[in-house]
From Swiss-Prot:
Cited PANTHER family: UPF0149 PROTEIN YGFB (PTHR37528:SF1)
Organism: Aliivibrio fischeri (strain ATCC 700601 / ES114)
Protein name: UPF0149 protein VF_2102
One GO cellular component term: cytosol
UniProt record similarity statement: Belongs to the UPF0149 family.
Entries under Gene3D superfamilies matching the protein: YgfB uncharacterised protein family UPF0149, PF03695
Name of a matching Pfam family: UPF0149
Amino acid sequence: MSEIKMPEFLTVESALKDSGLAVTPSELHGLLVGMISGGLSLDDQTWKPLIYDYTNDGMGWPDSAIKVGSAVFQCTVAELTAEKLALELLIPSEKESLMNRADGLSEWVNHFISGLGLVELKLDKTSDALKEALADLEEIARLGIDEEDDLEEQESLFEQIVEHVRICVLTIHAELGQQIHTDASKTVH
């Protein structure tokens, strides 16, 4: 079985821009991860109309954008439902400036929260750990980089924040997200 690989940030960015869509790779991935972590069905195409409504006034996407969006969705599902939980955020690479990466992370987190809203997350039925993770993400979404502070220190803090975002997202997904059930996972007594 071949491993599903996340498309590169620049590949996704190019496909979205070339299609005339006003959504960044970070925003798209954040939305998808939010919807999946909020309990979106993994077995159908319900994510597409939600994305179309949110990003393109309900209009469908051109084929090239659908292809890359589907690849991002499939890779995200694979990451979030694997035995070894992993999540790589689709944000600008380390080659980009810290400011660009911080902006990408902020876009990602804001759209993750929006993705949870798109699947109508009901906070009154969630655990305290989930509420705390969501509160942390809301705070992180408001963070910024101060160009006058020590950039080396901010670089280190940024990496810690990215890791904390992953932990918060995986906490939310563990409580609300669906898992892919296979015959191999069934226990025989």
